[in-house]
Each structure stands twice: as C-alpha cells, then as structure tokens.
Amino acid sequence: MAFTRRLLGHGVGLRAKHFAEHLAVEPPVDWVEAISENFMAPGGRPLAVLEKVRRDVPVVLHGVSLSIGSTDPLSERYLALLTDLTSRIEPAWISDHLCWGSHGGRYAHDLWPLPYTEEALRHVVRRILRVQEVLGRQLLLENVSSYVAFRASEMPEWEFLAEVARRADCGILLDVNNVYVSARNHGFDPYAYLAALPASRIGQIHLAGHSDKGRYLLDTHGEEVPAAVWELYAETVRRFGRISTLIEWDDHVPPLGRLVQESRRAAEVEAAALAALQQGALP
C-alpha cells in the first residue's frame, strides 16, 4: 500500500492553556494536533474541547506512549483506548515516536533512541505492522532528538528511519528541530540526513525550539523556532515540497496568538522556499 500525503497547511498543538480560546472561537489556524494520551479518558472538558475543535478544523492525533521500540509487549489496553479515540475523533492521521520509553512494564515518560541495528529494525517493523492492523490505518513515526548513541548501531539514524518506513509501509513525521539538535549533538550533517529520506513517505513536519547548553543542544519545545531550524525547514521544503507543518511549544507555553504567529511564519518560509525553487528552475 502506498503512503498518501494529505496537505492540511500549517497548524499548532492543542494545549490546555488555550482551551477557553478554542471553545470561544474557531481556531485561527489550518489544523491542530492533539496529544493522544490527554484525551483518552471518557468525558470531561479536554474531550469536549477536542470534539468542538474537530468540527472547526482538521485534527491529528500524536502519541507519546506507544513505545514502539520497547521489548515489552505492546499494550493492548493502550491500543484499545487509541482505537476508541480514533473512532470518536476521526483524525486526519495518527503519529507517535520511533523510540522506546518503557521496560519491564514501567514507563519512563521519556523518548529514548534505539540502537540502529538490523535486529532492532525487524523488531520495530513487526510492532508497527501490528499497530497498523489494529488501527486499520497507516501510522506516522517521528524521529526523536538524542544525546547518546549505541555503539552497537550498524547504520546511521536516517537510513534506519527510511528503512522502517519502507518495510512497515508507514509514514514519517519529520521533526526538523530534532534533526538539527541530534546533528549538533552527534556531529553529523543535517542536510545529508534530509537527502537520505524518501520524499514519498514524509507526511508531516514538526518545528520547535531548543536550548543551547554549550556542550549540547536540549530539545525543550519551550522557545521560538531558532534561525538555524528555519533554514533547515526551508531546505526541507525545497527538497520535499509542501508538507503539513506544525509548531510545537510544550514548555512555557505562550498565548495562542504567539503560536499562530509562528505558524504563519512557517507558511511564509514555505512560500519563499518554493518561490526561490521555481525561480531557479526558470530558463
């Protein structure tokens, strides 16, 4: 089955701080992304807000607890809750992270990188296929930021990500900030990372901020998108074309209007990158 990219435009994450504004007016963005786990409980204000928002603009679900790379069995309870939420909300798509965050039945509430080995690749692909079978739809997997690497890795991260998407017949949620953060932390070329990815598999982009700790960059989602990430996003657009793009801001969350400004800037950067590309192609 081929992966079908759906273009939604430029959106923002749905955060509790902005619930009142979302209830009062139609969201001033093209679409919103909701953290799946925050809306799995039946009833309550969060779900009521999400149901209202989905009547106004498209919604996608983004999970943080699937732990697709863990050696623990997939949580059937979690998949059941996600299936129920999917049936209720009918999101444009569902995504999670290409990582692991649980072991021995305990969740660390963190997103740890995988060893990039053939064994890990086969393991992850089997689990993605199972999740897609349960959900009845393709999944998008996001590249995570990382600060350590496994000596056992047999291939670079970008090759692993591309091969996961090919073998599992799933999509890629390309987090441009995570590419930049990991590139700085591990010393690889972020532009070479982009060049190795299959364009047809990329279904969504994340943009976010990070903190410079001197010796390393920390993916905080607590600042505006920095210049270097905007530059990498422009290259992403030139290489892959228009892709649904979301602004992530999870810490020190500003007013909704500030997120909307960042989303509009993403639209401007995208338009400029495409215009420059077209201009360069003219005789």
Curated annotation (Swiss-Prot):
SUPFAM superfamilies: Xylose isomerase-like
Regions crossing the membrane: none
InterPro entries (alphabetical): MbnB/TglH/ChrH, Xyl_isomerase-like_sf
Pfam families assigned to the protein according to its UniProt record, in alphabetical order: MbnB_TglH_ChrH
Domain of life of the source: Bacteria
Classification via NCBIfam families: PRK05409.1 (NF003818)
Family: Belongs to the UPF0276 family.
Protein name as it appears in the record: UPF0276 protein Anae109_1558
Organism listed in the record: Anaeromyxobacter sp. (strain Fw109-5)
Lineage: Bacteria, Pseudomonadati, Myxococcota, Myxococcia, Myxococcales
